[in-house]
Amino acid sequence: MSEQIKKEKSLEHIEFETKYRIDDSFLIQFKQIIDLLQEEKKFVYVEGPDLYFTYPDWWFKNNTQWDPSGTFVRYRRPSYGLDNGRRQVTWKYKKRDSKNNIQRKELNFDLMDKTTDNTVVEQLDSSGVKFNFSIVKNCHIYNFSDATIVFYTVYDTTYGKPKKTDSFVEIEINEEKVSEMSEEEAWAIISKYEKVLEPIGVNAQKRLRKSLFEMYKK
């Protein structure tokens, strides 16, 4: 029997996703493929900065179960009021013995409108994490009942002027349902959408091992 994906009933959830590098010229074809699917879906476009913060070495000495290569804090704030202006602080934890970034522990906190960016950054700084880098993501998001599929472009904005532009496709299992699935069932959903997106080069062989954090960390 395949292992059950466990989830604590709180703001915490298990993230189960795969990522693929892709040329940005495939965006229109990607959207056409998704639009032709008969399943009910919702589309959202979001863009804006993501600020990444890292823990100091002493923190990992006291929390040896977590891997520095995949444990961090992210502050996300959409531009132009997109996504209803929802801002979010996310703590992501990768186990030290994990072989990939497909399954990670994640804690999400949605912020109130009156919470300022300065307040968030000051609080993160006082908690011990330090700013490491920033990126801007332009995301075309399709939410299905079993997964979310995203085509997004990333710009590195850490030093001001945008550089290092990359594009990716991401398939993430619905976070509210993944805890009730076996790992085999979760992989079946990933494979289903890989087959759908195979015309633009999305397949199991193209799954990336590194997270965005590992790609852009300074």
Locations of regions flagged by a protein language model:
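N-terminal strand-loop-strand beta-hairpin
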Residues: 2-147, 202-218
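Intrinsically disordered, low-complexity acidic/polar segments
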Residues: 27-29, 82, 160, 178-181
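Hydrophobic, well-ordered secondary-structure segments
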Residues: 121, 165-169, 187-190
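Charged, well-structured binding/catalytic surfaces in domain cores that contact anionic ligands
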Residues: 139-172
